[in-house]
Amino acid sequence: MRHALRLAILLTIAVTAPAFAADEPPPAEVSKPSRLDNLFDRLKRERNEKAAERIAGNIWAEWMKSGSASIDLMMQWSNKASEEKKYDVALDFLDQIVTLQPDYPEGWNRRATVHFMMENYAKSMADIEHTLRLEPRHFGALTGMAAILKETGRKEVALDAYERALAVYPMMREAQSEVSTLADELAGQGI
């Protein structure tokens, strides 16, 4: 049941994040890395949870922009297949995406998410690690990593991954809750 709840949270973040971006238009004529840097700076400083969610949504919207109409279309198809629980179909699209555009972090992250949904944790972790090599601030990948580590009984390392996510996105409620829970559990074990 907890696995299903975590999966629902991850899917909700991934699918609805672009909707938050609609609230706040991006600055005109700024490069994608500059936009992301500015958004991450704002996200780290923001102390209002709802405002932070909007900024995170803008970051997700930037991550979704591959720079290729074909890749963007395949991402949409893979998302639709995932929503319909057609994970093999989603993986087919995502395999093509990471082959055609290996420097696109969100392609790797989405493939990691599908592997997670299929409980292929080793493959998911490999894709998460690739995502984080390309975008070390990817709070979605960090929380995905933490969820897998927690699920597989590696609570200390999971706590570290959640703390890394909070260093990027301090107002992320899910990560705050998990840090509190894991810290309490580990304190009870006498780490």
Predicted segments, located by residue:
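Conserved structural position within tetratricopeptide repeats
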Residues: 61-64, 98-99, 130-133, 166-167, ...
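Residue-level signature of tetratricopeptide-repeat
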Residues: 111-112, 145, 179
